[in-house]
């Protein structure tokens, strides 16, 4: 069993998906499964995703049509066989310590049920895009 399952929903992410996946595989924490759920991409991103299918910890779900973000995410979650599930957008890029820090935070207290990263804007790196929500 993996420590984390990372789910990336994708539709027409040709310009970002490969770099997004590569940033996940560059993590210092390697105890994860990566699931990409493709929602009927018509660009080259589906082929980009298929190029990772030989990796043991990679799963690709091909929907053929756009079933929507929530459905795609739920498909990935349904296949999760790990302690944690991590949602990751197809246009996001992670620093090498990202997953290790998320898991360390989640493990710090049994009362923690959700964690979120500080997201920095890609082209305006001095600006935060999202800093989480209070639940």
Task: Give short role names for the model-derived ranges.
Residues 23, 38-47, 65:
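A conserved acidic beta->alpha catalytic loop
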Residues 32-40, 59-63:
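Short beta-strand/loop segment that forms part of the nucleotide-sugar
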Residues 23-31:
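Short, acidic, metal-binding catalytic loop of nucleotide-sugar glycosyltransferases
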Residues 85:
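Short aromatic/hydrophobic "clamp" motif used to bind/position activated sugar donors
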Residues 96-133:
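Conserved donor NDP-sugar-binding/catalytic core segment of glycosyltransferases
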